[in-house]
Amino acid sequence: MSEIETIGFHYVVEAAGCDPEILGNADRIREIFLEAAKVGNMEVKSSYFFKFSPTGVSGVVIVAESHISVHTWPEKGYAALDVYTCGTKAEPEKAVDYILEKFRAKYAHVSEIKRGIEEDDDTFTHMIMTWEESLRKNGNGKG
């Protein structure tokens, strides 16, 4: 069976049981995302993060290959993540794993969307694969 050709990979991640202190810290999230871009072999172009009052952060890192974005709810230990990349150089799954580790997520629901699958000359579609993971069984990060 041959590999399906795609223009890009889009990871949509529901991260739960995350460290609320990290989720409420825009500067720390920026550091994590910039390093995640490196880990995922992406070229950073720009970034912007906004801290809401009293809590929560929204932010984006623009990479040459597309973007990494987040919206957090520290009071719920929840983060909504998107990692989208085009081309063959980037490794978005490594960026996702790095972010989940640094957020200390205990649980993740991940959808991988292969985008831009060409059906014919003018038509494109996508394919979705979804999985769930229990990442940590206790609070110290060890299974």
UniProtKB/Swiss-Prot annotation:
Pathway: Amine and polyamine biosynthesis; S-adenosylmethioninamine biosynthesis; S-adenosylmethioninamine from S-adenosyl-L-methionine: step 1/1. Binds 1 pyruvoyl group covalently per subunit. InterPro entries: AdoMetDC_C (IPR042286), AdoMetDC_fam_prok (IPR003826), AdoMetDC_N (IPR042284), S-AdoMet_deCO2ase_core (IPR016067), S-AdoMet_deCOase_pro-enz (IPR017716). Is synthesized initially as an inactive proenzyme. Formation of the active enzyme involves a self-maturation process in which the active site pyruvoyl group is generated from an internal serine residue via an autocatalytic post-translational modification. Two non-identical subunits are generated from the proenzyme in this reaction, and the pyruvate is formed at the N-terminus of the alpha chain, which is derived from the carboxyl end of the proenzyme. Its EC number is 4.1.1.50. The modification Pyruvic acid (Ser) is found at residue 66. Keywords: Autocatalytic cleavage, Decarboxylase, Lyase, Polyamine biosynthesis, Pyruvate, S-adenosyl-L-methionine, Schiff base, Spermidine biosynthesis, Zymogen. It catalyses: S-adenosyl-L-methionine + H(+) = S-adenosyl 3-(methylsulfanyl)propylamine + CO2. One of its GO terms (cellular component) is cytosol. SUPFAM superfamilies: S-adenosylmethionine decarboxylase (SSF56276). The record marks 65-66 as: Cleavage (non-hydrolytic). It is an enzyme of class 4 (lyase). Gene3D superfamilies: 3.30.160.750, S-adenosylmethionine decarboxylase domain. Its cofactor is pyruvate. One of its GO terms (biological process) is spermidine biosynthetic process. Belongs to the prokaryotic AdoMetDC family. Type 1 subfamily. Catalyzes the decarboxylation of S-adenosylmethionine to S-adenosylmethioninamine (dcAdoMet), the propylamine donor required for the synthesis of the polyamines spermine and spermidine from the diamine putrescine. Heterotetramer of two alpha and two beta chains arranged as a dimer of alpha/beta heterodimers. This is S-adenosylmethionine decarboxylase proenzyme. It comes from Thermococcus gammatolerans (strain DSM 15229 / JCM 11827 / EJ3). The gene is speH.
